[in-house]
């Protein structure tokens, strides 16, 4: 257990407020005291292309110096309305998933994703929390369909466009995340604001189809959970906190052994009902590997990341979390990080599934994700 405690920060993906690394006490604490394994950029961190590249270069260097490993820098860059590196900061406009789906042009989807990926790579960003593979079958859905974040209302089209989008991002050297598992397309409300019950609207066959198809093709880097409640899957907890949904359905039935990242634990659907402490422990216990905390500043001035780490530490010490489960989560995060560093073994980019399947602490695990590396070594961010 003791070797795990200093590495608990590796299970965090945290948002911060600064725009420059030097002399930023919050960012220094996050990278060097909490040792967060991943950092998340928002519009509040983005002023101009050169500024972002300078910020991420400092973050990569500082994390390497403090923690002795690569920092994963992530962003929501779906295109359209959800694009943190947007026109207000001097970047060109981008197409939404809805725009691309309506065009029916898969080549255009791949090219747009490649363009977005190139923008991220130049900015020093490693991980795009995209594409959205929610099937937009509910026209009244406010957060996915209303914001044009779905490729379409039919699973076949979602799979085809997501496949093209993944190919474009991977060609640019950027990691990806399918979201929001097990599906947010049927909801009538927004989990950013409060509790979302999809028991009567979820369509499992439809909503799981993109995950089944893309996982089978070996092109998935990570999967993000949704904060939706479906009593047919779990009568007590929403998906992010549900062992039945993450451990049972996603990892068990669907056979996913790669990284699972939560949606923001500070969203109303989670924070208002469970609190950050309990949510962090429940999520990791359910099978989530990376806890997304969009804002490190709690209303009382404390660091949300530190609260989460301390909650995980206490849960390890009192037996609520098994050391093997935490160790396996750390292994999967290490394997995801390694996907950026592994060169291609052939012109197709297909590699064996060996990397990350053996624990750095000597335990043996099944394949931790897809059987392809994300990125061409030549496409890695220069800051790395």
PLM segments and residue spans:
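Preference for extracellular/luminal or secreted protein segments
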Residues: 1-34, 243, 252-253, 271-384
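Second-shell residues forming the walls of enzyme active-site clefts
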Residues: 6, 16-17, 22-23, 45-65, ...
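Soluble non-cytosolic domains of exported or imported proteins
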Residues: 25, 103-111, 152-156, 160, ...
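Catalytic domains of carbohydrate-active enzymes, especially glycoside hydrolases
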Residues: 29-42, 115, 122-127
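Active-site-proximal loop/short-helix segments
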Residues: 80, 85-89, 126-148, 175-195, ...
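A generic, well-ordered mixed alpha/beta core segment in the N-terminal half of proteins
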Residues: 89-124
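Flexible, glycine/proline-enriched loop segments at strand-loop-helix junctions
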Residues: 99-107, 146-156, 194-201
């Amino acid at each position: 257990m003791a070797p795990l405690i200093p590495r608990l920060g590796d299970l965090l993906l945290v948002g911060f407020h600064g725009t420059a690394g030097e002399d930023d006490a919050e960012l220094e604490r996050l990278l060097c005291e909490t040792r967060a394994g991943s950092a998340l950029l928002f519009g509040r961190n983005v002023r101009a292309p050169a500024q972002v590249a300078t910020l991420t270069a400092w973050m990569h260097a500082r994390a390497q110096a403090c923690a002795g490993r690569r920092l994963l820098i992530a962003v929501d860059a779906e295109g359209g309305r959800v694009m943190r590196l947007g026109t207000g900061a001097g970047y060109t406009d981008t197409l939404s998933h809805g725009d691309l789906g309506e065009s029916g042009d898969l080549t255009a989807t791949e090219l747009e994703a490649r363009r977005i990926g190139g923008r991220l790579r130049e900015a020093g960003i490693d991980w795009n929390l995209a594409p959205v593979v929610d099937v937009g079958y509910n026209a009244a859905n406010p957060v996915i369909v209303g914001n044009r974040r779905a490729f379409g209302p039919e699973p076949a089209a979602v799979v085809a466009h997501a496949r093209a989008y993944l190919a474009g991002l991977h060609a640019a050297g950027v990691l990806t995340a399918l979201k929001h598992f097990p599906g947010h397309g049927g909801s009538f409300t927004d989990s950013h604001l409060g509790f979302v019950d999809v028991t009567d609207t979820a369509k499992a066959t439809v909503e799981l189809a993109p995950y089944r198809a893309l996982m089978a093709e070996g092109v998935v880097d990570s999967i993000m959970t949704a904060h939706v409640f479906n009593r047919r899957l779990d009568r007590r907890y929403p998906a992010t906190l549900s062992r039945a949904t993450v451990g049972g359905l996603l990892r068990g039935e669907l056979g996913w052994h790669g990284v699972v990242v939560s949606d923001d634990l500070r969203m109303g659907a989670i924070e208002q009902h469970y609190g950050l402490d309990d949510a962090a422990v429940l999520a990791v216990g359910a099978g989530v590997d990376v806890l997304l905390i969009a804002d490190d500043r709690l209303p009382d001035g404390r660091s949300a990341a530190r609260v989460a780490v301390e909650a995980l530490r206490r849960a390890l010490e009192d037996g609520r979390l098994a050391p093997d489960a935490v160790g396996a989560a750390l292994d999967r995060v290490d394997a995801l990080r390694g996907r950026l560093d592994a060169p291609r073994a052939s012109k197709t980019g297909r590699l064996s599934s060996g990397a990350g399947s053996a624990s750095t602490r000597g335990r043996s695990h099944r394949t931790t994700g897809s059987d392809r590396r994300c990125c061409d070594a030549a496409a890695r961010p220069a800051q790395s």
